[in-house]
Amino acid sequence: MARYDRAITVFSPDGHLFQVEYALEAVRKGNAAVGVRGTDTVVLAVEKKSTPKLQDSRSARKIVSLDNHIALACAGLKADARVLINKARIECQSHRLTLEDPVTVEYITRYIAGLQQKYTQSGGVRPFGLSTLIVGFDPYSRLPSLYQTDPSGTFSAWKANATGRNSNSIREFLEKNYKESSGQETIKLAIRALLEVVESGGKNIEVAVMTREETGLRQLEEAEIDAIVAKIEAEKAAAEAAKKGPPKET
């Protein structure tokens, strides 16, 4: 095996950092995650695996709060996510304690992306094998935000985006169907996008919502998700029936 394939800080002759590319591959094999930014709502939806009967499903959640006004979902290695989330939470608390002000969504995104980039350039470590979707409301303007970071340390702002397995298919769906909306329509779009790749319906979907009016992140209950999925399926069936037209008379 070539030296640049083993070493994190050595470029290959054609300009690749293979350890970063391997981390990106870990993201592509991870659970699908979707983020949608509405006018007054931000939504994160992730694909979740079925939990054993004896496991507390709350301990396996993939959407977490970083602060009262910021939440994060990720795709990739769960253990790596735990480390990154803990560091981000400490930074949020430190910022409040030192400056007596909450962090902005962009600030904590830059911090997380900076950590990920640092781990592509340092000896004795490896890149974080995860990509994050970060949503929240600016504490001053109260405007909604959605950002994505990846293992290379790159970050960017989005109206709607996806990461994890089949993220390209989900992103194409979002590009065709995204309209700036509010409330339930934003939630419905996120779930519709995830259903493009999740075949088992609402039981394997985790959804969390943050609104301008309410403080904190609200995890949707299974019954709420099932009701929205049923509505989406009914609308889809009605649209297909409309395409076929009325039955022909014999």
UniProtKB/Swiss-Prot annotation:
Share what the entry says about its subunit structure, partners included: Component of the 20S core complex of the 26S proteasome. The 26S proteasome is composed of a core protease (CP), known as the 20S proteasome, capped at one or both ends by the 19S regulatory particle (RP/PA700). The 20S proteasome core is composed of 28 subunits that are arranged in four stacked rings, resulting in a barrel-shaped structure. The two end rings are each formed by seven alpha subunits, and the two central rings are each formed by seven beta subunits. The catalytic chamber with the active sites is on the inside of the barrel.
Q: Where in the cell is it found?
A: Cytoplasm; Nucleus
Cytoplasm as UniProt keyword: yes
Crosslink Glycyl lysine isopeptide (Lys-Gly) (interchain with G-Cter in ubiquitin): position given as 62
Protein name stated in the entry:
Proteasome subunit alpha type-7-B
What biological function has been recorded for the protein in this entry?
A: The proteasome is a multicatalytic proteinase complex which is characterized by its ability to cleave peptides with Arg, Phe, Tyr, Leu, and Glu adjacent to the leaving group at neutral or slightly basic pH. The proteasome has an ATP-dependent proteolytic activity.
User: Of which family is this protein a member?
Assistant: Belongs to the peptidase T1A family.
The record lists the organism as: Arabidopsis thaliana
Q: Does the keyword Ubl conjugation apply?
A: yes
PANTHER family per the record? PROTEASOME SUBUNIT ALPHA/BETA
What GO cellular component entries does it have?
nucleus; plastid; proteasome complex; proteasome core complex, alpha-subunit complex; vacuole
Main localization, broad class:
cytoplasm
Pfam hit, one: Proteasome
Task: Supply the InterPro entries for this chain.
Answer: Ntn_hydrolases_N, Proteasome_alpha, Proteasome_alpha-type, Proteasome_asu_N, Proteasome_sua/b
Some GO term, biological process aspect, for this entry: which one? ubiquitin-dependent protein catabolic process
This protein's UniProt keywords: Cytoplasm, Isopeptide bond, Nucleus, Proteasome, Ubl conjugation
